[in-house]
Amino acid sequence: MGGPLLPSPELITAYRNTDYQADASPTVTVTVRIDLHDPAVDGLLQSRKVGTAAFLTAFNPLSEPTGDAANARAQECLVRDLAILGIAHIAGRGVGRDETWPIEPSVLALGISRVAAEELARRYRQNAFVWVERGKAPELVLTSGLR
């Protein structure tokens, strides 16, 4: 048996070159960038009275293109799971800086623990998620051993 399968270096680069946008209000969008601390992100977390968050999606499991209907159903299930766990979220999206990547709906789960974020990412067969802590640069967290 081999070790856990990790995303290709190209996929990891694509994840790192994505702007993770959260709709803080109808007129304000906050952008999270991996490894780049932004006081606006801290302000969003502080305004929601949380110290942590995670960008999560259920779209395109294992970064394999999946049909619109299946993606929408999976995303609805993710949002339902967050509600069951009592975790508030903000609608968002991942927008690749390379315009060949499609915009991917996401959520910024507020106040979630890192363990819970990883469990949800694994449940929805995601290669990675973005971990956010107030006062720190956001981190790309790989979820190895999914396949």
PLM features per residue range, with description:
Residues 96, 133-147:
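Short proline/glycine- and acidic-rich turn/helix-capping motifs at secondary-structure junctions
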Residues 67-68, 119, 140-143:
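A short secondary-structure junction signal
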Residues 57, 90, 108-110, 130, ...:
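Residues in well-ordered beta-strands of folded domains
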